[in-house]
Amino acid sequence: MKRFITVCAISAAMTAGTAFAETVKVGYMTTLSGGAGIIGKQMQNAVNLAMEHKGGKLGGMDAEIIFADDQRKPDVAKQLANRLMKSDRVDVVAGVIWSNLLMAIHKPVTRNGTLLISSNAGPSPIAGTQCNKNFVSMSWQNDQTPEGMGKHMQDAGIKSVYLMAPNYQAGKDMLAGFKRYYKGTIKGEVYTKLGQSDFQAELSALRAAGAQATMIFQPGGMGINFVKQWKQAGMDSVSKLYTVFSVDGVSLPALKDAAIGILGTQTWSPDLDNAINKKFVGDYKAKFGAYPSFYAAQAYDTILAIDHAIAKSGSKDTAKMRSILAAGNIPTTRGNLKMNTNQ
């Protein structure tokens, strides 16, 4: 059996095997360094687990996975995407946590005729008229999940809310989605620095605002720091905290009991009752000693989607894989997915 390669930085790597065997190459871009590396490592773990489950093959073809560390920098992401396509000649570019990075690589990859599959980022500008037929999302459009939170808080009769998110594309999308369904009073709408770790000034302003509830989007380490500082400041007595993509499998090991009582909306849960999810969660816990996050689940699903597309089409051709994915019925941890079109 041909082995598959995991590389933590961009590098050329060839698998050992038969001289004329066809190999599918996937460039998987995520953040593996810095504070955001906690998210990227879960995604890398999930990709490796999926490849183990598939015996190192995708759709029956020998497979090579090349991991690229984007360092959470758009310019680095663009350079890596070009290298993956031009030097490594990958068949698929996948992954991407951050919406500003996906915005940076979207046009170069799709216009090259390469299939681009997002495991997480879903910036609203690339839906609708800016959508490209070579782009597929295995997650969401950013505004969708906070729309659910907005509807919940509206239905719950919450009269006023304070909003907070990082100042980048996803943060703006999240709050826009929330406001689409929440019609109460917005006491404040604050955009923090991406990667910010100290929220004392924001908490002071929030306390003074007197909002009945607070809704935040602060993924990864930002959410860990925010919730810890919220608790230390005794903010539970001031405002009820609601979150999207802020309290999850990435942050729970650090937050522990501090997360109790915080409500969030999400499209995946480790206790979803289907065979694929049970195997994924069970094997992930056994191998890595912790529950997976939704980031990990979506990374795992991305590999399942590529496997499905190649198996059903019998090809790694972009148009043929794209056609299979558009038809839906993709087996994932969330059940069999259907695909809509935003083109």
Question: Locations of the language-model features?
Answer:
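Extracytosolic ligand-binding ectodomains
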Residues: 2-10, 21-343
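N-terminal signal peptide c-region/cleavage motif recognized by signal peptidases
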Residues: 16-18
